[in-house]
Amino acid sequence: MAAGTSNYWEDLRKQARQLENELDLKLVSFSKLCTSYSHSSARDGRRDRYSSDTTPLLNGSSQDRMFETMAIEIEQLLARLTGINDKMAEYTSSAGVPSLNAALMHTLQRHRDILQDYTHEFHKTKANFVAIRERENLMGSVRKDIESYKSGSGVNNRRTELFLKEHDHLRNSDRLIEETISIAMATKENMTSQRGMLKSIQSKMNTLANRFPAVNSLIQRINLRKRRDSLILGGVIGVCTILLLLYAFH
């Protein structure tokens, strides 16, 4: 009976790790899609400065469809991983050996933390993509209004020239913000790839920590230092972003 329940737990852990690996790859591709959409929007804006054609890029709709498809796939994977975590929670609540139950709870909490990180990263990337798309649609509408006004009143109209200059200034500021976002997303992708390598190492270290209390104490100190380094890195990135925004709107 004990062997059967142990096999059930290991099967759940195997399914959880497989879904986590799939989600990690999907989220990296999802982030790259958002970055490429941002770059294509910036190139489209620069092209519109020298052309009166206001027709959107053909690959915009293709990227939108790809975005919707990938978002649905990631949501389904998150739902499946949530279900696996719920089954693991039910198993830990019914485990009979207290010492074993403590070790299982530690493993379950680690899988829950990974699920929470993936969910937060997905919603953040999705929100960034939607914001870029809405901003591009808004700017496209503004460009159409400008072209319509130019055709009705003439290019030499003073008000039109002032409006166009202000529009160019806004486009330059918007492009600088997009480049800043791209740098931040590239940094996040590098950290995501590093997290994949560290995750397997941490899993082995956690297994050793459950067996040797001294190793567990060492791992806790390492985790505290890692969190401190993450806070410092996040603070530096935040300050750099604020400085770039201040420079852009100064």
Swiss-Prot record:
Chain spans, region Disordered: 39-59
Any single Gene Ontology cellular-component annotation: SNARE complex
Keywords: Acetylation, Coiled coil, ER-Golgi transport, Golgi apparatus, Membrane, Phosphoprotein, Protein transport, Transmembrane, Transmembrane helix, Transport
Induction section of the entry: By monocrotaline.
Lineage top rank: taxon: Eukaryota
Transmembrane segments: 230-250
Any one GO molecular-function label of the UniProt entry: SNAP receptor activity
Record's subcellular location: Golgi apparatus membrane
Composition bias, Basic and acidic residues: 41-51
Cytoplasmic side: 2-229
N-acetylalanine PTM sites in chain numbering: A2
GO biological process, alphabetically ordered: endoplasmic reticulum to Golgi vesicle-mediated transport; inter-Golgi cisterna vesicle-mediated transport; protein transport; vesicle fusion
Coiled coil spans: 10-30, 70-93
Chief site of localization: Golgi
InterPro entries in the cross-refs: Golgi_SNAP_su1
Function: Involved in transport from the ER to the Golgi apparatus as well as in intra-Golgi transport. It belongs to a super-family of proteins called t-SNAREs or soluble NSF (N-ethylmaleimide-sensitive factor) attachment protein receptor. May play a protective role against hydrogen peroxide induced cytotoxicity under glutathione depleted conditions in neuronal cells by regulating the intracellular ROS levels via inhibition of p38 MAPK (MAPK11, MAPK12, MAPK13 and MAPK14). Participates in docking and fusion stage of ER to cis-Golgi transport.
Family recorded in the similarity comment: Belongs to the GOSR1 family.
Protein name as annotated: Golgi SNAP receptor complex member 1
Native organism: Bos taurus (Bovine)
Organism classification: Eukaryota, Metazoa, Chordata, Craniata, Vertebrata
